[in-house]
Amino acid sequence: MTSTLERYQRIAPLYDLLDLPFEYGRYRRIRPLLFEGLSGHILDAGVGTGRNMPFYPRDMRVVGIDLSPAMLARAERRRALSAATVELRHMDVTRLDFPPASFDAAVATFLFCVLANDLQVPALRELRRVVRPRGSIRLLEYVRPRSRLRRLSIAVWQPWVAWAYGAGFDRNTEAHVSEAGLEILDARFVVDDLVQLLTVRVPG
Ligand SMILES: C[S@@+](CC[C@H](N)C(=O)[O-])C[C@H]1O[C@@H](n2cnc3c(N)ncnc32)[C@H](O)[C@@H]1O
């Protein structure tokens, strides 16, 4: 079976091209919402090719981590587009090499729809550990849509998305948040009933 690492090593050279219609049709409009009201030292988990970078506010110091060196190499090229200071590290979100409370906040975009179900809680616990008490975690994720029509269209896309990205539309990240000891402050749809922005708080 192909691992997540192998998948992203394979798809990295094509990732931005394949994602282009979604990036410009959907994501660019919503990425800035992630950073509203955040400042200081921020973790971008699963930074990918660095698509969030143009939206990092100037006064942030961001550390982007990713499992795939090939995706990180693409992100490195995009670093110049960021107004913030950006450091990139090769790391697994379920085993972060940072001391507790290292960050003021963490963001992850389309990471949890890629992580297998049994990794969701361990990854959320790691984010909880490295973000300071009362800090924020923001997640932008695909969720299983309510409408039948969208579920049908997703069923058509699912085999390709699973093969290429290892992504699923059936992850229940919102439910795993409380299991990881985090508190949901806000959960709202930002693209139809497909993409959700979750704002979560670390207890403290
Ligand atoms: C769908 S891409 C999203 C990339 C980027 N956040 C974006 O918004 O375009 C998912 C990314 O998560 C990374 N990833 C998958 N599993 C990971 C893990 N366990 N730890 C860190 N990164 C991981 C992949 O290598 C890939 O770059």
Enumerate the predicted regions with their spans:
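A short acidic, Gly/Pro-enriched loop at the edge of an enzyme's catalytic core
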Residues: 94-106
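A short glycine-rich, Lys/Arg-flanked "PGG" loop and its adjoining helix->strand segment in the class I
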Residues: 121-133
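Conserved alpha-helix/loop element of class I SAM-dependent methyltransferases that forms part
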Residues: 21-41, 51, 55
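Short alpha-helix
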Residues: 165-181
